[in-house]
Amino acid sequence: MKGLVKNREFMNMGKFFNIRKLIAATLLFAPALASAQESAVSTSALPFLDRTHGAVRSSMSGLGTVSDDAYSHWGNVSAAAFSSKTFHAGVGYSLWQPSVTKASVTDFGALWPISERWAVTAGVSVAAYPIEHRMDEYGVALSDFRPMDAVAGAGVAFRIIDCLSVGAAFNWAGSRGIDSELDAFAADVNLTFRKYGVNVTAFAKNLGTAVKSSDRQNFALPMSAGLEAGYGLNFGKSSLYGAVQGQCWLGGPFGISPSAAAEYSWNNMIFCRAGLHYGAKKNGLPSYGSLGLGIHLYGFSLDLSWNAALGAMKNTFACGVGYSF
């Protein structure tokens, strides 16, 4: 019996070391993937991979160091290793760029700490666009078609020491348009430091090889890398958190986008959030401001966000509900 227990322990240790190797390999090959894409292509594909998921991050202009919730998979998977919850899941809806793309987006995310230092994440996001009308070469109407984008994946996070964690998320992305179909696999990697109210995250997003279209053209994934830093203060029942982020775009034209956000909470129940994001015009990324509210009570959460802008992000709206225990 003792031998059986020891064998199981060795098997579990082997699994953990394999996951560490997978994360390390992703971090190691990240620069190579970036340079390969930049040398192969100059136009990025699957831009929806950069969409902000979850009403909390939407209301903070995409900043995610504070997010160790159900949507950690999408923003900062390494933060999942710091979660104090046993399980956290959430579902959300977003009306994305209603004056331009008019996309209806449904998001799902989950976080599960499986041990004191390990956590796993999962996420699914589906965007549906307005119906397009098909016609043949003679102008005769055919069946209608609804373009769709989807992303689904899983991630893992490991707390190396009490204040430092690493994580990686692996996603499949697919796009179905009226004249094209694209599929790709992409990885996100994060390294997070958290101590004395300070949060610092280094990240690389959408790492992967070039996407080939049906007409054999190569397109880069919208890869980016950046650094985010935040600090939180508590005074009585109130708390205040602020963060700044710098992000550079590597897939396609090079661009830089700075962001800043703040969150006020009372008794960890009522939340008010705001953020500003300066876009990278070369990459087609607009600038916008964001506002949001949240109510968290008895494990349940309700969060809302709204974006203000002169361009594509004008009146983008997101809402989400979640449960944790």
PLM region spans:
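Cleavable N-terminal export/targeting peptides
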Residues: M1-L49
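Subset of outer-membrane beta-barrel
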Residues: Q37-F325
